[in-house]
A protein has these predicted regions:
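Catalytic cores of nucleotide-sugar-dependent glycosyltransferases that transfer UDP/GDP/TDP-activated
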Residues: 1-167
């Protein structure tokens, strides 16, 4: 991302300043902060796991999350998750665009977040239409987010621009 910021298109008017920094301008990549979320020690998980036990641990957390959210408990259904602000630059409009096709597949979608009213309304409607596949949680809860990180099969982050910030 730091290389992209050297181009005017991505830099929001700051490309010259950022380019002038030369080699001391670096990027920090996204990822889960293991000080805040560690599947071996985070409280509130159905099962703790590490790189050797993750298959069984993820499955136990997934089944527990499905039960908690009122979704059918199905180990073979792909669970997609988003923990995000519901804002255009976070790519929520991309989810809106593919939602119909996505729901025609064997998937469950879990969304946690708040934001622009139009996206909240869209997600509420999606949950009404596909309630056995969709759980929309218009809030932010670090505890629920941790359970989602522990149990989801895939994490969606369709940001149009993500300056190595928060998910």
């Amino acid at each position: 991302y730091c290389q992209e910021l050297r181009y005017p298109y991505y830099a929001h008017g700051m490309s010259q300043v950022l380019s002038s920094r030369g080699g001391d301008f670096t990027g920090i990549t996204n990822g889960i902060d293991t000080k805040l979320f560690d599947p071996m020690t985070t409280e509130g998980l159905a099962a703790h796991y590490n790189e050797k036990t993750f298959k069984e641990g993820k499955l136990q957390n997934k089944l527990a999350l499905q039960k908690t959210l009122g979704l059918p408990e199905d180990r073979d259904t792909a669970m997609l998750a988003m923990v995000t602000r519901l804002a255009g630059h976070k790519g929520i409009d991309l989810l809106c665009y593919i939602a119909e096709r996505l729901m025609s597949r064997r998937v469950q979608l879990v969304v946690i977040g708040t934001g622009e009213e139009k996206y909240e309304w869209f997600l509420r409607g999606l949950q009404e239409r596909f309630g056995r596949q969709v759980s929309v949680n218009l809030c932010f809860s670090a505890d629920l987010a941790n359970v989602v990180y522990a149990g989801a099969d895939l994490y969606l982050m369709p940001s149009k621009s993500e300056p190595c910030g928060l998910s």
